[in-house]
Curated annotation (Swiss-Prot):
Gene3D superfamilies noted in UniProt: Aspartate/ornithine carbamoyltransferase (3.40.50.1370)
Binding site for carbamoyl phosphate: R58, T59, R108, H136, Q139, G264, P265
E.C. numbers: 2.1.3.2
A GO MF term: aspartate carbamoyltransferase activity
Lineage of the organism: Bacteria, Bacillati, Bacillota, Clostridia, Eubacteriales
Species of provenance: Heliobacterium modesticaldum (strain ATCC 51547 / Ice1)
Catalyzed chemical reaction(s): carbamoyl phosphate + L-aspartate = N-carbamoyl-L-aspartate + phosphate + H(+)
Record-given protein name: Aspartate carbamoyltransferase catalytic subunit
Amino acid sequence: MAWQHKDLLGLRGLAKQEIELILDTAAPMKDIIGRDIKKVPTLRGKSIVCLFYEASTRTRTSFELAGKFMSADTVNIAAASSSVVKGESLIDTGKTLDAMGTDIIVIRHAASGAPHLLAKHVKARVVNAGDGAHEHPTQGLLDLYTIKERKGRLEGLTVTILGDVLHSRVARSNIWGLRTMGAEVRLCGPSTLLPPELAITGVKVFTRIEEALEGADVVNVLRLQLERQKKGLFPTIREYARQFGLNQERLKRCKSDVLVLHPGPMNRGVEIADDVADADFAAIEEQVTNGVAVRMAILYLMMGGSGSGAVH
């Protein structure tokens, strides 16, 4: 099976077989990362531009390494050091990159829908690296990959997403991906940080952490996105940690083989305790490694690849 879309803008609307294609392709990519010489000629001669209008460490570096491991020419553009500061529009920036022969544009933007707008106006393939509070599809995919790698399956699992769901594009991509793959999804957080419209997606919504964790196979912990919040959504950070922070005692309500995820960056002692973040049942560093593999798979498939040809 080959990738049938020009762009990857979100997980909402992707078929189960399309998600499986990406996850299956990521496995041999992870083998490449484990080699002493992390280089294959798969995308030699192809150009990838990472266009980031928001700060990023993990996602931007992950995409850059993913391209370089497959021999693509990878360029990073920070909006603060580009013509954006001179008033250039997103569409004009995209057309400029098109004119330079760019094959793939990886974009992160504060405005929901920005990657969709860009994709309509450029010939280059577009990958959404996070748009506002809308979606973060590659993070969702790497979370799915990590769960499947640890648990052996996705279907039938109970996954609790805990924290600031209202402002989280990661939560939305996880919801769509997990639901498509047959998992039960629970959301938990203060009522002020739980968007009511997500209840219609078929997920279960909780405001008591003890109920949300009962029998969970996986807990995906979200950080408080204070940079996106208005005041008054919860009393204090200390109070939030007391009511919704994930600690060892609360984890006793989960399955004995529970898996803990966190998309990073972590606020230790707020949404997650140190002894949880550093435990063997947490796969937080694995998520970072798997992120490179999943993004390699996406870039490879979007450039027409299929099968295991990328590993040679």
